[in-house]
Amino acid sequence: MPPKDLLGDRDKAGRPEEINRWLVENGGKDKVAVISSDAMIYGSLVASRKHHIPRDLLLRRVKNIEKLHDTHPKMPIYVFSSIMRTPKDGASSGTEEPEYYVKYGKAIANYTKIDNADTSGLNESYQVTLREGVPEAALKDWLSRRRTNLEVNKPVSYTHLTL
């Protein structure tokens, strides 16, 4: 296991590049590696929910995970990912979501229920009400981060890292 000072927790992000460096240098000493993609890409699970990390840096960190197999070809590498959640309201989010979620969490949760759904049965004014219940900047931030996290998780999910 990497040194604790490299790992994140609910209050601070870890150091993905240094965790990767540690795995490259020390990974071959173990029979198997079980890796959190959230730690390797964002710094921690909580950091994956609050980040403003550029997409190109996130994708480079995904490549670091993929390269571990090349570095340690005989070591099975199991990578797990968490899909970004949408708590039902601000009270359920604790301190693990952006600050605006405390105030607008319920409205964001309701909006995301219909965001990619078939809304043909919903009254148009209800859809507008859901969108207007959240400041545009907060909704844009939330949806952008969800989209980024999904895009970054896709290559992790479909690589051949589990052998």
Regions found by a protein language model. Name each.
Residues 16-19, 51-65, 142-156:
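Well-ordered, non-membrane alpha-helical segments in soluble/globular domains
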Residues 97-152:
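Acidic, His- and aromatic-enriched active-site or binding-groove loops in soluble protein domains
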Residues 1-20:
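Basic, amphipathic N-terminal segments that precede the first structured/catalytic domain
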Residues 41-53, 91-100:
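Surface-exposed, active-site-proximal loop segments in enzymatic domains
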Residues 17-29:
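Short, well-structured alpha-helical segments in soluble
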Residues 2-5, 34-45, 80-84:
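Short loop/turn segments at strand-loop or loop-helix junctions that form parts
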Residues 72-77:
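A short helix->loop->beta-strand "cap" motif at the edges of active sites that frequently abuts
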Residues 159-162:
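Conserved small/polar residues in nucleotide/adenosyl-binding loops
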